[in-house]
Design a protein with these regions (language model features):
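PAS-family sensory/regulatory modules and their coupling/dimerization elements
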Residues: 32-100
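Short alpha-helical segment of the dimerization/phosphotransfer core of two-component systems
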Residues: 153-158
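Short helix N-cap motif at coil->helix boundaries in the Bergerat
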Residues: 185, 267-278
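Short acidic helix/loop segment immediately C-terminal to the autophosphorylated histidine
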Residues: 134-141
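Conserved micro-motifs of the catalytic ATP-binding
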Residues: 173-178, 216-219
Length: 331
């Protein structure tokens, strides 16, 4: 069983303990015959036992434990053990590790808070400009045109955000099935270069497709194109003006194909690199929003690559650009 169980006798000494309890509390020796304080040295647990014995009813509380991997959250329940004569014969403690559940709940809260913020910002901007137009700005053609362009920009941002939210929701729920077949990687990269050509020209960035001709992988072509689009789009946004963005690829020594997108921008700080694939995480929050980013692009990249059975990672040194790598199964 996954729950940790410990039984105390009428004298308050450990009579029985299972392996799950020992794992939860990192117990290495035999604690049978010891008191709870001798075994665990946790005042909260002793207080729970005292309260349970005093009230004679089921008690429970949450216990936070320091562990090597971080804080562990336990739900602890206690109940008196009664004999045939109705007298107290001891007490039982049942502990359930709810760390993962807590983490998921925190992730859900953060996600809802982020979505609310991301939706509220463009909606507030649109509402503000519409009110200004209604107050008389519509009668000034130059001002009205500028305001309408801004409204369109924020409406587009809302559209991109909703599309990305739907995509990541389908990916995480497994509803988005990958149509795996032989994919021409050079050709897909060339499509992405064409799709983002105008943005690159506007930023004076040179796009280079260095994926070897003939390199192929087992992949969903449409989703792979989305992965490269997101990576190259980011590289254009955050790379330096008049710089280069390179799409490369090779057949790795292991039975896999590796692709990468490299820019020569300012790079990503070491402390930010482990988080860049998180939903809504932005290294430069203000700049990302100004550039119309949703904060979901790299999270989508990660989920699509993992749905292909591949891995994705980033390498970067401050001032030397960033390279995003990912692997696929060969065709």
């Amino acid at each position: 069983m996954s729950e940790g169980v410990l039984v105390l006798d009428a004298d308050g000494r450990v009579r029985l303990v299972n392996q799950a309890f020992e794992r939860l509390f990192t117990i290495t020796g035999d604690i049978r015959g010891r008191t709870l304080m001798e075994a665990l040295r946790l005042h909260q647990m002793q207080e729970l036992v005292n309260t349970t014995l005093l009230k004679g009813q089921i008690e429970h509380f949450e216990l936070e434990l320091a562990a090597l991997e971080g804080t562990r959250s336990l739900q602890v329940n206690s109940a008196v053990v009664l004999g045939g004569d109705g007298r107290q014969q001891g007490l039982i403690l049942v502990c359930h590790d709810q760390t993962r559940l807590k983490q998921l709940e925190n992730t859900r809260r953060e996600f809802v808070a982020n979505v609310s913020h991301e939706l509220r910002t463009p909606l507030s901007m649109i509402k503000g400009y519409v009110e200004t137009l209604l107050d008389g700005a519509k009668d000034k053609p130059e001002v009205a045109t500028k305001f309408l362009q801004t409204i369109e920009k924020h409406a587009d941002r809302l559209t991109y955000l909703i599309e990305d939210l739907l995509t990541i929701s389908r990916l995480e729920s497994g509803q988005l099935v990958m149509n795996l077949q032989r994919a021409d990687l050079h050709g897909i990269a060339e499509h992405v270069v064409t799709d983002l050509g105008d943005r690159a020209v506007a930023k004076q960035v040179k796009l280079l497709n260095q994926v070897p001709v003939g390199l192929a992988a087992q992949a969903d072509g449409e989703r792979l194109r989305q992965v490269l689009f997101n990576l190259v789009d980011n590289a254009i946004k955050y790379g330096r003006t008049d710089g280069n963005v390179v799409i490369g690829g090779r057949k790795a020594e292991q039975p896999e194909v590796e692709l990468w997108v490299r820019d020569d921008g300012p790079g990503i700080p070491p402390e930010a690199q482990p988080r860049v694939f998180e939903r809504f995480y932005r290294v430069d929050k203000a700049r990302s929003r100004d550039d119309g980013g949703t904060g979901l692009g790299l999270a989508i990249v990660k989920h699509i690559v993992q749905s292909h059975g591949g891995e994705v990672w980033v390498e970067s040194e401050p001032g030397q650009g960033a390279t995003f790598h990912f692997t696929l199964k060969p065709a």
